[in-house]
């Protein structure tokens, strides 16, 4: 199916099949579509609302074209990632949570990019923390195996996405591409906590991940609009495991913590985000740092649970709290900075 044929169906509100979507996305991701065609397709799908088959077909193509990362020790292998686009400008909750999950014994293959909609994307934060990003796939695998966490900078692994960069920027709106990245982990992670920008995406994305080999998936969106588990409101969850999706709402109280407002958790840039995370991982000198620690525990607890380390999310949160308070999460962040920098320096000296 060519792109004009696909567009004709989409504008008539007709869903594409998995195979049709694979055809179309194959063209988009190999340079066979013009910017106007890519933009029209993205807007048309958004207006129609992307179907399960369309999302599945698109994810399949992206996974086929990804530059992969090999992780030797795949026990408790997990990612915690958000689509972004919630407009809240919070500190990097999922990135901070990945260090806590690593301290718990998970292997976190963290996938992310630069800021798209927030003030500080995960790559911006890690760079500010002195963590080397421009590592080879083999070196990233070494980080995950040795430190328990490695960061995969999305543009280095999704070269095929370059064809959509122009249209995405010019459209300035959320499209299918915001969803695809988090579902296409270069290390082939099948245990995932994924925050999304709309509650109506929770169930379909959990179902798609399940279709495509997912083992344990939590897709979350909070009632106050975050692509995270919120400290300030109920969070809707679609959880896939054992072949089925269950939907439910969670509160911080369900997980053993008290609710609190998000005041003080928004940041202006990656330096402010890092300062807040370091304080949360350290002495917690401000009310905001205490709240940040709780927010991280809620989300890291989900990753610890989904990785298979604990039997329940609540047990994961309790473990996360301990690791934040005893300094082990901060230590893991330092270790990744040292280990990744040593790999980079080793490269440059050859």
UniProtKB/Swiss-Prot annotation:
Q: Which cofactor does it need?
A: Mg(2+)
Query: Entry's InterPro entries?
Result: Anthranilate_Pribosyl_Tfrase, Glycosyl_Trfase_fam3, Glycosyl_Trfase_fam3_N_dom, Glycosyl_Trfase_fam3_N_dom_sf, Nuc_phospho_transferase
What this protein catalyses is: N-(5-phospho-beta-D-ribosyl)anthranilate + diphosphate = 5-phospho-alpha-D-ribose 1-diphosphate + anthranilate
Per UniProt, Mg(2+) 2 binds at 227-228
Its pathway is:
Amino-acid biosynthesis; L-tryptophan biosynthesis; L-tryptophan from chorismate: step 2/5
- Binding positions (5-phospho-alpha-D-ribose 1-diphosphate): 82, 85-86, 92-95, 110-118, 122
Q: Name one GO cellular component term.
A: cytosol
User: Which residues make up the binding site for Mg(2+) 1?
Assistant: 94, 228
* Residues annotated for anthranilate 1 binding in this entry: 82
Pfam families referenced in this protein's UniProt entry, alphabetically:
Glycos_trans_3N, Glycos_transf_3
Q: How is the cofactor bound?
A: Binds 2 magnesium ions per monomer.
Gene Ontology molecular function: anthranilate phosphoribosyltransferase activity; magnesium ion binding
Assembly and oligomerization: Homodimer.
Query: Which purpose does this protein serve, as stated in its record?
Result: Catalyzes the transfer of the phosphoribosyl group of 5-phosphorylribose-1-pyrophosphate (PRPP) to anthranilate to yield N-(5'-phosphoribosyl)-anthranilate (PRA).
By sequence similarity, the record places it as follows:
Belongs to the anthranilate phosphoribosyltransferase family.
Q: PANTHER family from the xrefs? A: ANTHRANILATE PHOSPHORIBOSYLTRANSFERASE
Tell me what this protein is called.
Answer: Anthranilate phosphoribosyltransferase
Instruction: Specify the species.
Output: Alcanivorax borkumensis (strain ATCC 700651 / DSM 11573 / NCIMB 13689 / SK2)
What lineage does UniProt assign to this protein's organism?
A: Bacteria, Pseudomonadati, Pseudomonadota, Gammaproteobacteria, Oceanospirillales
